[in-house]
Swiss-Prot record:
Gene: aroB
Alphabetized SUPFAM superfamilies for the sequence: Dehydroquinate synthase-like
Binding-site residues, NAD(+): T130, T131, K142, K151, F169, L170, Q171, T172
Chief location: cytoplasm
Organism: Exiguobacterium sibiricum (strain DSM 17290 / CCUG 55495 / CIP 109462 / JCM 13490 / 255-15)
GO biological process, one term: amino acid biosynthetic process
HAMAP family cross-referenced by the UniProt entry: DHQ_synthase (MF_00110)
Enzyme class: lyase
Gene Ontology cellular-component annotations: cytoplasm
Protein's UniProt name: 3-dehydroquinate synthase
Pathway: Metabolic intermediate biosynthesis; chorismate biosynthesis; chorismate from D-erythrose 4-phosphate and phosphoenolpyruvate: step 2/7
Positions annotated to bind Zn(2+): E184, H245, H260
Molecular function in Gene Ontology: 3-dehydroquinate synthase activity; metal ion binding; nucleotide binding
Domain of life: Bacteria
């Protein structure tokens, strides 16, 4: 069992353990809630909702429950789905004492968290992650929606009341979801735990599923905890958590069938080339092929350039989180270097 306390503007606990939902009785806002409004996607609802509702009833037998489901995938992080959820909240009688439970992966955490941040000017919410990828997104308080111009262009910083993470949920994940979460875990290792990263980068898909998950998830969360506690609202070093994400987000947004983490894997190759880190580039390319990532249809450089210009870290120039001799920094990269890195990424990955 891991118990961490995230010391943000509103401190909260993170539990990583079997049957973590039982910890809800320790959350003050849950004790005071007039109902639990569960927001999830249809896949998670089919797999886990009956069990989750029973566990909630065991702890709070008289607290009403309401479940809202959305379609799986990034398409649900939209203004139209957000509006439907707000209206559903009004129709089911939610109040400022209602607690939202975000049950699912990163998309659900972002969407349900943004509903919580804005419904009736803010109601409490819990993150209950069901994917490996969500070890990253469930901690730190970033919530939001996508627009047709790019990812996460509408959003807020809104901390959960707690994060209740049961690794048993991960046993129902597809291979793609395992890969997706693994690349975010690797990113945390590359940022702050080189030995951890070196262990991860040599693994295959079957190895990943046999990891001591609670320990490895906790290690990834602790990297993020250390950064978020210093820079909650991303005015400085929190931007380093976007390592591999500037190009990765562009690839993800331009592709219909690539997961977030798989796109981050490609983004890590791109940024390793920018850094001139040939060893890391080669290891990442080997890993991407070993894990069976199916590369998306490649778009022209100009399309990715357009999407990178919309990244929230960028103003006049396109800035990347890069590692140099003195550690990580945000560096403005000119278009010529970006095109060169793109061409090398295409060659290294044999990206048709």
């Amino acid at each position: 069992m891991t118990h961490l306390t995230i010391r943000a503007s509103r401190p909260y606990s993170v539990y990583v353990e079997p049957d973590a939902i039982r910890r809800i009785h320790e959350v003050k806002q849950a004790q005071e809630a007039d109902r639990f409004w569960i927001i999830t996607d249809q896949t998670v609802a089919d797999l886990h909702m009956a069990s989750i509702r029973r566990q909630l009833e065991n702890v709070f037998p008289v607290t009403a429950q309401h479940v809202s489901t959305v379609e799986p995938g990034e398409g649900s992080k939209s203004l139209s789905v957000y509006q439907r959820l707000l209206e559903e909240g009004i129709e089911q009688g939610a109040t400022r004492k209602t607690m939202i439970l975000a049950v699912g992966g990163g998309m659900i955490g972002d969407l349900a968290g943004f509903v919580a941040a804005t419904f009736l000017r803010g109601v409490p919410f819990l993150q209950i992650p069901t994917t490996l990828l969500a070890h990253d997104s469930s901690v730190g308080g970033k919530v939001g929606l996508n627009l047709r111009w790019g990812k996460n262009l509408v959003g807020a910083f809104y901390q959960p009341s707690a994060v209740l993470y049961d690794p048993a949920f991960l046993q129902t994940l597809s291979d793609r979801e395992w890969r997706s979460g693994f690349f975010e875990l690797l990113k945390h290792g590359l940022l702050a735990r080189p030995t951890f990263a070196e262990e991860l980068i040599g693994l295959g898909l079957s190895d990943i599923k046999q990891l001591p998950l609670a320990d490895w998830i906790s290690a990834g969360i602790q990297v993020k905890q250390h950064i978020v506690e210093q820079d909650e609202r991303e005015t400085g070093i929190r931007a380093f958590l976007n390592y591999g994400h500037t190009f990765g987000h562009a690839v993800e947004y331009a592709s219909e069938d690539l997961s977030h983490g798989e796109a981050v894997g490609i983004g890590l190759v791109f940024v390793s080339i920018l850094e001139g880190n040939e060893y890391q580039t080669n290891r990442l390319v080997e890993l991407i092929h070993r894990l069976g990532v199916v590369l998306p249809e490649r778009q022209p450089f100009e399309r990715y350039l357009e999407l990178m210009k919309r990244d929230k870290k960028n103003d006049v120039s396109i800035r990347f989180v890069v590692k140099g001799q003195d550690g990580f920094s945000l560096e403005a990269i000119d278009q010529k270097r970006l095109k060169n890195a793109y061409d090398q990424t295409v060659r290294c990955l044999h990206w048709a």
